[in-house]
């Protein structure tokens, strides 16, 4: 049988030394939401709890300011 290699999860924000996650940085925030617009959980992304809270807050703020969509484009 074939063995599957799982990539080790790590927190990108800790590795880069980020102090605060900016809600205006839409390119970074898009990596942490699904196609349907949901916030991806930390058990999938490997983000530490401190940064997951900041990430959720930043995504919600950018949604409120219409920088990110609440849902996908359903017609």
UniProtKB/Swiss-Prot annotation:
Which InterPro entries is this protein grouped with? Ribosomal_bS18, Ribosomal_bS18_CS, Ribosomal_bS18_sf
Keywords from the named record: Ribonucleoprotein, Ribosomal protein, RNA-binding, rRNA-binding
Q: Does the keyword Signal apply?
A: no
GO cellular component, alphabetical, reads:
cytosolic small ribosomal subunit
Q: What does this protein do?
A: Binds as a heterodimer with protein bS6 to the central domain of the 16S rRNA, where it helps stabilize the platform of the 30S subunit.
Tell me the subunit arrangement: Part of the 30S ribosomal subunit. Forms a tight heterodimer with protein bS6.
Q: What is this protein called?
A: Small ribosomal subunit protein bS18
- Name of encoding gene: rpsR
């Amino acid at each position: 049988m074939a063995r599957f290699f799982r990539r080790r999860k790590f927190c990108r924000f800790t590795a880069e030394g980020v102090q605060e996650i900016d809600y205006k940085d839409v390119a970074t925030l898009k990596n942490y939401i699904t196609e349907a617009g949901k916030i991806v959980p930390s058990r999938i992304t490997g983000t530490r709890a401190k940064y997951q809270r900041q990430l959720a807050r930043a995504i919600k703020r950018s949604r409120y300011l219409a920088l990110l969509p609440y849902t996908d484009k359903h017609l």
